Every structure is written in C-alpha cells, then in structure tokens.
Amino acid sequence: MKFELDTTDGRARRGRLVFDRGVVETPAFMPVGTYGTVKGMTPEEVEATGAQIILGNTFHLWLRPGQEIMKLHGDLHDFMQWKGPILTDSGGFQVFSLGDIRKITEQGVHFRNPINGDPIFLDPEKSMEIQYDLGSDIVMIFDECTPYPADWDYAKRSMEMSLRWAKRSRDRFDSLGNKNALFGIIQGSVYEDLRDISVKGLVEIGFDGYAVGGLAVGEPKADMHRILEHVCPQIPADKPRYLMGVGKPEDLVEGVRRGIDMFDCVMPTRNARNGHLFVTDGVVKIRNAKHKSDISPLDAECDCYTCRNYSRAYLHHLDRCNEILGARLNTIHNLRYYQRLMAGLRKAIEEGKLESFVTEFYQRQGRPVPPLNVD
C-alpha cells in the first residue's frame, strides 16, 4: 500500500491509498461486511454506490466459516467475490464487547464462543494469522478497545497493554512474511496525556497507517472532537489516519475537518434496515405514515438506483410489509448517500472550500456548525 497526499485545506487532507487491487480516494468511507457480505448487497451493487474498499470482520469470519474454508477458496476476496481492497479489524472490539463471558490476560483473551459456548483463546499472534489467511489488504493490530467510561488508571493500563500487543502484532505480521499493510491503533480513552504515550509508542514500532480507536463508544461528542484535534497532528503526515467505527454523517464531516482520512461504520446499512434513511436535509423515517402517499423520490438530489426509480410511497409500502427488497433499496440509498458525502468533501478540499461545504451541510439540516479548535 502507498499513501499519496495531494492537498490540504486547514487540517483536512485529500489523497489516495494505492493498492495492487485498486485505488481508494481519500477521505474514504468503508462499508462494513461483517460476515463476508455488506448485508443484502452483491459486490457489484456495493461497487455501484461508489465504495472502493470494504471492511471485513476477523472475529466473526474466524468463528464462521473458519480459516480452513476460507483457504479452500483462496482468501476473503475469492470467497465473497469482492475485487477491491479489504480492511479487516483484528477482532479486539468484538471480543471486548462480549462482556462477562471473556477474561483478559497479558497473553490474550479467553472467552466462550457466542455460537456454541466452546472455550476459545485469541491473542495478537492468532489475530495476525487469521488476517493473513483472509488476505486482508489492511491488517489491524490486536488491541484492547478501552470501554467508556474508564478512569485514568484503568485507561493507562489498558493503553499500555495495547502497546505491548501492538509490538507482538508487528512481530508476528513480519514473521509471516505478510506484504500487505499493518495499521496501529491509538488508545488512551479521553485522556490526552495517555493518547500522547500511545501515539509515540506506536510510531516507534512503525506502522503503515494509524487508527484512532476507543472513540464513539459513548463519550460526549465534544470529547471525541477534542481528542481528534489533539491526536491527529501527532500522527506522521505521510501515513493515513483512520477513525474506527465512526459514524453518523456529521461525524464524518467533523473527522475530515480534523484530519482523518478513513472511516467505517455499520450505521448506513443497519439504519437502512430499520427504515432510517439519510437525505440531504437530514433523515427520513420511511415507515412514518406521512410517506404513505408521497410519490416523490427519497432524495431529489441523489443519483442512486433507489432514488432514480422508486417513490417514498413504494419504499414505505415495502417497509410496512417487511419485504426484503425494501431493506435492499434502503441500503443502496444509504451507502450511496455516504459515498456522495465523501465525494463532496474531497471536492471541497481540492477547491479550498471545505468550510463553505461544511456550513452548507449543516444549514441544509437546520443545525449550527460545531466549533473547530485547531490552529
């Protein structure tokens, strides 16, 4: 992987990630394909929304179908027939969200398989091996996603263990001879001094890119913005910056304003299945009765397959009848909305008009622009 940085506007950056499997224009949003599929979508449909890279879930693909089935096909690309790059998370977030059925040690994490209850162990080395078999174009280190709220002492211990696990991840990644990219993950909760130690330690180990983890886990938006404003300038400028698990459209806008290059989130797909659709002026809840006889498109400014062909009334009807097609059409639209938003942000950065774009984005939704506390 090669990262090319073209231009900046304030702290926002316009560039691209170059892989053997294709080019990803940044800032980029990555749809989430947890089980080897972006829910309800064929790879061709995902590509048609404008997505150039997707995310796969190491933890879930390890449990089902498992490494051996994956290797029978080649790798995850061959298994699911996605031709572009794939980033895989390390499994850390899923393990730590298991709560009471897991035990964290210095060696790794002991837990019960949520499918059948069998005892399982996952550590940095195993995570690197699974992601190697998946053929991930971007591999994420195995870390502890520090929960929120966490006091300073807990956050410090968690961050320090994540640093030790980062080194173990790096060592196993290298010993496997993996030629793809490995990203470090910055932890430290909402504490700037801990984030400083994490960034410094990860840069000393050396990675192809750096993710900001442990945000969007329940902390106030002001804390997320503050940590991004503090951390992003410390990440080497020639490396991509990835904000994990984020988020709402406004979170993407605010991340880009603060220097983030990559995002992922289940929100566009999950919300689509719940009839919660993103449009230029905000959100449409398609199951509301007011859409029953509305023959207008979902979003007159959207060029997606759904908006070009179907009315709000039809989408409302499908949702009320629990038709699978409704969830699919909604997903196509939400994914395209996110990609159109990213394309708009990229163009605004190129033209040096990002803040004008941001102002219009919030004005269309009748909301104030959040403050930006950067030099």
Curated annotation (Swiss-Prot):
The record's keywords, sorted A to Z, are: Glycosyltransferase, Metal-binding, Queuosine biosynthesis, Transferase, tRNA processing, Zinc
What does the note under cofactor report? Binds 1 zinc ion per subunit.
Entry annotation: catalytic residues: 89, 264
Query: Where does this protein hold Zn(2+)?
Result: 302, 304, 307, 333
Molecular function in Gene Ontology: metal ion binding; tRNA-guanosine(34) queuine transglycosylase activity
Q: In which pathway does it act?
A: tRNA modification; tRNA-queuosine biosynthesis
Tell me its EC number(s), please. Answer: 2.4.2.29
Q: Which GO terms describe its biological process?
A: queuosine biosynthetic process; tRNA wobble guanine modification; tRNA-guanine transglycosylation
Q: Which domain of life is it from?
A: Bacteria
Q: Which reaction does it catalyse?
A: 7-aminomethyl-7-carbaguanine + guanosine(34) in tRNA = 7-aminomethyl-7-carbaguanosine(34) in tRNA + guanine
As cofactor, the record names:
Zn(2+)
UniProt family annotation: Belongs to the queuine tRNA-ribosyltransferase family.
The UniProt subunit note reads as follows: Homodimer. Within each dimer, one monomer is responsible for RNA recognition and catalysis, while the other monomer binds to the replacement base PreQ1.
Function comment: Catalyzes the base-exchange of a guanine (G) residue with the queuine precursor 7-aminomethyl-7-deazaguanine (PreQ1) at position 34 (anticodon wobble position) in tRNAs with GU(N) anticodons (tRNA-Asp, -Asn, -His and -Tyr). Catalysis occurs through a double-displacement mechanism. The nucleophile active site attacks the C1' of nucleotide 34 to detach the guanine base from the RNA, forming a covalent enzyme-RNA intermediate. The proton acceptor active site deprotonates the incoming PreQ1, allowing a nucleophilic attack on the C1' of the ribose to form the product.
Q: By what name is this protein known?
A: Queuine tRNA-ribosyltransferase
Name its species: Salmonella typhi
Q: Which gene encodes it?
A: tgt
